[in-house]
Amino acid sequence: RAANAFFSSNFDEALIVTIDGGGRDYDKNGNVVITTFTIWKGEGNKIKPIMIIPIEKLNLGVMWQLCTTNIFGLSGGYPKGNQAGSVMAMAVMGDPSEHYEYFKTYGGNIQHTNFDFARLQKLASESEEQRFNIAAAMQKVTEDIVRSIILKYAKQYPSKNLCLAGGVVLNSVMSGKMFDWFKDI
């Protein structure tokens, strides 16, 4: 994904970010790693990995998929397609404060924890406001995690260009905010 994003961009150099539910990448030593969040530096006809987060450390894509299906009862894929976008739409109408700390505690890594889907599913079924607030908390935690990681590496590897790839960057609300987070994108 990093190569596709960079080499199809027409940039001579760029910081490249991939965020998804899981992909195969190579670490700096050439070992295959299942990853969910990577940052690369592209220059000329080469890209090199700068930062790789393995699937067991962070997985925002799986967080969205599991919450979409287990809390909101929507499709996470086949046969109806992934309806995480519907949850993202709910997020803009909610207040993240009530559930933010709970999602922040798990830091986008809910598949390896004792995340309480049943409690949140019950709350979501009680009112539209709760559905919107839960979605807003997911959205805010996603944005905060992505922003903090990208900004850290953007300072270390400055570039006027940013290439994005992966399912999580299809989060249009978050991607739109990236224009506020970074100058000259």
Task: Give the location of each predicted region.
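Short acidic/glycine-rich loops and adjacent helix/strand connectors
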Residues: R1-I185
